[in-house]
From Swiss-Prot:
One of its GO terms (cellular component) is extracellular region. The modification Cysteine amide is found at C84. It comes from Centruroides exilicauda. It is found in: Secreted. This is Neurotoxin Cex1. Residues 1-19 form the signal peptide. Gene3D superfamilies: Knottin, scorpion toxin-like (3.30.30.10).
Length: 87
């Protein structure tokens, strides 16, 4: 019983530690979400936590929104086969 509890705890921790992170990207254009206030940024945090993104925290890094604790289903920059601003 203790072994089962330890295994379950490890799996939960792995999910938390290895959560996806990256630049939030528009699926239609392939471009990163831009921001100008570096560091803590309400706009980036709001976008990352939006129900369709599912992130845990967002901030502005290198003039684009960086998100942490994203689900694997949320696309991050770059999207394969889609270049921002290029046809």
């Amino acid at each position: 019983m203790n072994s089962l509890l330890m295994i379950t705890t490890c799996l939960v921790l792995f999910g938390t530690v290895w959560a996806k992170e990256g630049y939030l990207v528009s699926k239609s254009t392939g471009c990163k979400y831009e921001c100008f206030w570096l560091g803590k940024n309400e706009g980036c945090d709001k976008e990352c936590k939006a129900p369709n993104q599912g992130g845990g925290y967002g901030y502005c890094h290198a003039f684009a929104c960086w998100c942490e604790n994203l689900p694997e289903s949320t696309p991050t920059y770059p999207i394969p086969g889609k270049s921002c601003g290029k046809k």
